[in-house]
């Protein structure tokens, strides 16, 4: 699988591909990227193409982006979304958007960037959906997995955790404490392995 761009809700390669003002240029850049992937492939081998935006919990922006993208007849196989609850809405918002994307676009959906803090970081001035503790981090990932696994038509394709191995340095979203000890969140991967 190849992702064309990263979180491209605002376009890419500004100013030429900046959105919303340059949709024609953006579409040309997307087609060029996809064609470049295919041109670099061995005969009869074509990796899946993913388009990734950062609106996991925002159905309206997701709809606007993909509806507009599809008017350009852009061919892709997977929808990628980022989902950080302090930026992208509640788990209910994520669930509603996953259901919408599955029914509307009928493509597998990956959460390509997901994370939650194991110590207080993001929710200093507002209530957190889960405690920002190692156990709260684990509970958050379990809940996100449930949303993905319950996406209609089995189109919830998986989750990628953002930066799990920074070991308590610049991030509290990783899977290890400052001494390198693994946090409880790691057990979620055993619990939710698809067979």
Give the residues covered by each predicted segment.
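Structural preference for beta-strand elements that scaffold enzyme active sites
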Residues: 1-3, 46-50, 75-80, 108-111, ...
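Substrate-binding cleft of secreted/luminal carbohydrate-active enzymes
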Residues: 86, 108-120, 126-195
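Active-site cleft segment of glycoside hydrolase catalytic domains centered on the general acid/base Glu
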Residues: 1-70, 74, 89-98, 104, ...
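Catalytic metal-binding/acid-base residues of hydrolase active sites
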Residues: 7-9, 55-56, 82-85, 115-117, ...
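Short, surface-exposed, polar/charged, turn-prone segments marking secondary-structure boundaries
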Residues: 31-32, 77-80, 107-109, 186-189
């Amino acid at each position: 699988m190849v992702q064309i761009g990263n979180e491209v809700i605002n376009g890419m390669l500004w100013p030429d591909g900046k959105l919303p003002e340059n949709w024609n240029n953006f579409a040309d850049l997307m087609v060029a990227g996809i064609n470049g992937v295919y041109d670099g492939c061995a005969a009869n081998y074509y990796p899946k193409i993913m388009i990734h935006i950062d609106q996991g919990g925002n159905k309206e922006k997701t709809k606007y982006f993909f509806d507009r993208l599809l008017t350009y007849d852009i061919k892709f196989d997977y929808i990628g979304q980022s989902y950080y609850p302090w930026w992208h809405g509640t788990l209910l918002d994520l669930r509603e958007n996953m259901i919408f994307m599955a029914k509307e676009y009928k493509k597998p959906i990956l959460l390509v960037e997901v994370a939650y803090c194991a110590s207080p970081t993001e929710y200093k001035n507002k209530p957190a959906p889960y405690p920002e503790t190692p156990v709260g981090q684990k509970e958050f990932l379990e809940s996100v997995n449930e949303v993905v696994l319950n996406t209609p038509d089995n189109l919830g394709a998986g989750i990628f955790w953002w930066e799990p191995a920074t070991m308590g340095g610049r991030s509290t979203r990783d899977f290890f404490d400052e001494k390198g000890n693994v946090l409880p969140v790691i057990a979620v991967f055993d619990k939710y392995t698809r067979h």
